[in-house]
Amino acid sequence: MTSYIKSGLYLIGFMTLSTLASAQFSTDSKSPVTGSADDVDYRPNLTIFSGQVDVRQGDVRILSDKMRVHTTNGASGSDSIDGAHKIEAIGNFYYLTPDQEVRGHQGIYLKSTETFTVTGDVVLLQGDGNVVTGDRLVYNLTDGTAIVNGTCKGRKCGSKGRVNILLKNTSN
């Protein structure tokens, strides 16, 4: 029984961390954070959400097959939300807003660098029709910069493995 209560409390704490991590992404960071998964496995310093993970805040939605929240023990020896240092969303990763969709194999948030990295067949779709594809996208939450990398360098690769960009004509 205590395990279920602790898991429930940790889920609330995780959602609070998600609010902080996604505040830069969400247009409504004061909205409540909701989440669901088929299973939650709580361990010291690690909580694993498995099976159709769905986290929402305002108009932002994150989907994945599995999500791992890594923490460091707090001063009192119990897991503290302040100690969460890494969030991994693994398998069929989607980051969705009304104006943008990012998808890839996985997304990783690192508190130490304030970065959000998406890897594996990354596709960034913008509402205006622009598309960027690559193998890796790194978004810096502090300064708002983004870097997209491919797996192949040079013209000999063609478009396979390189960063590809499609910009829609905005002129009338």
Please annotate each region the language model reported.
Residues M1-N172:
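Mature-chain termini and adjacent capping regions
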